[in-house]
Amino acid sequence: VLLKSLQEYAARAQPAAHVEEAGGWWLRHSPGDAWWVSAVLPHDREDRVTLAEEFCAERGSGVRFQITPGVCADDLDARLDGRGYARGHDMSLRIASTSEVLRQVHADAGEVTARPTDEWLTAWQSVTTRDVSAERDLLSRVEHPSAYAYAEVDGQVVAVGRAVAEQGWAGVFGMATLPQARGQGAARSVLAALASWAAAREANHMYLQMEKANSTAFRLYERTGFREVCSYHYRIRT
């Protein structure tokens, strides 16, 4: 139940422009946003693959399934493999107690705002190279309490991240550090700010999703108390 809840909290923290629920399956379409925002969440044991494929075909988009072991039907991954879906993007879902993050982060907290500032978005865009106007739209759809944290060096925003609180959990998203500021504690400062905000909102646990190949992120989160609760991946057909 925890894994399903966390993946759904994460989906609500990165809300697609269009979502249809079919039983426990979330069919999502969000042109202009990061590809994973449109991934299907197949969160019950029914076979709704054809329905999901039709949903995506009607909207002219590729089909992507987020495969979380223990949440999806046990044979879904193999069935998608048999239908020609490629496996990609090995991911790690990690959790920590908020108090542990605050203990381990060893950094002065950065600043927090309730909405993304232009400076926050500029720093985010320069690292991710994604479309700012699409991201503004996505962030405006988030319904749960949110925090936007940033760290500055000489008056310039050099690292950003955001958190969304739901049901006692704060999810961490959008962590980005400018290349010249990496390895200097800026990301830790952002994480400290988000953890402080989470604690003040009585979100006593934190979670995040990260690509397993991201060794820099792995080191940061390993050292700040986040431990893996599951691996998951995507099945993709374009």
Summary of predicted features, one role per range:
Residues 47-53, 174-179, 183-196, 200, ...:
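Conserved acetyl-CoA-binding loop-helix of GNAT-fold acetyltransferases
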Residues 132, 136-178:
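A conserved beta-strand-loop-helix scaffold within acyl/acetyltransferase catalytic domains
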